[in-house]
């Protein structure tokens, strides 16, 4: 082989190698962009989503008024079908013979942050009725506000009960007539709303509220 042919062959080899390297780099860039382009802006990392779809079955409750009687008391509570932050199925099925207490919380809300320790104290005191199903509902999620993401916030706060992640549109909160945070709704074993409360509640007051609600 002449020197000219050897040089030409060597140049061709370099061109092929460079072409392969460029193709690999392009493929990696495309893969990274594809992995980062998601229409679901509710996820923070991995398989954990800060919002989950919520299906509401039943009439939506009126918003809790600031004062006066609550128009929702005695009405059938809507059923909720949704999921936890990790996608595990969850459901609130009023009328199944079990009483529920739903606690709607927002990670950024100072009143919620003050209330969670009280609820933990309430549980640790042994005052929670054995048949009462307590479910937290994480709603009002905002990535630009304190304590985001809520999936980590509930862990850091030591929340001891299951948590349903509300939808981006806050379907669960709207269905129960949320008017502020934290927001409590107690549903009797008959499936009807017994009481709704908005704002912080001390442990002694909570005991009284729950006892009266479940006795009605």
Language model segments and positions:
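Short, internal strand/loop/helix patches
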Residues: 149-189
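N-terminal targeting signals for export/organelle localization
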Residues: 1-76
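Short active-site neighborhood of thiol/selenol oxidoreductases, capturing the structured segment around
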Residues: 90-113, 119
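Conserved helix-turn-beta segment immediately C-terminal to the redox Cys motif
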Residues: 98-99, 114-138, 203, 212
């Amino acid at each position: 082989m002449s020197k000219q042919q050897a040089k030409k062959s060597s140049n061709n080899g370099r061109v092929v190698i460079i072409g392969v390297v460029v193709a690999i780099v392009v493929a990696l860039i495309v893969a990274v962009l594809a992995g980062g382009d998601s229409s679901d802006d509710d996820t923070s990392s991995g398989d954990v989503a800060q919002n989950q779809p919520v299906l509401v079955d039943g009439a939506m409750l009126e918003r809790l008024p600031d004062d006066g009687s609550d128009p929702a008391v005695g009405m059938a509570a809507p059923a909720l079908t949704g999921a936890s932050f990790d996608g595990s199925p969850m459901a609130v099925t009023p009328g199944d013979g079990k009483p529920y207490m739903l606690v709607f919380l927002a990670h950024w809300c100072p009143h919620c942050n003050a209330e969670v320790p009280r609820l933990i104290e309430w549980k640790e005191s042994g005052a929670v009725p054995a048949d009462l199903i307590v479910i937290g509902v994480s709603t009002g999620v905002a990535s630009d506000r304190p304590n985001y993401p809520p999936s980590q916030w509930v862990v850091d706060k030591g929340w001891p009960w299951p948590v349903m992640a509300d939808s981006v549109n806050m379907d669960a909160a709207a269905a129960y007539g949320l008017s502020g945070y934290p927001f409590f709704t107690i549903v009797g074993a008959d499936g009807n709303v017994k009481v709704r409360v908005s704002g912080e509640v001390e442990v002694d007051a909570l005991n009284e509220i729950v006892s009266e609600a479940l006795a009605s």
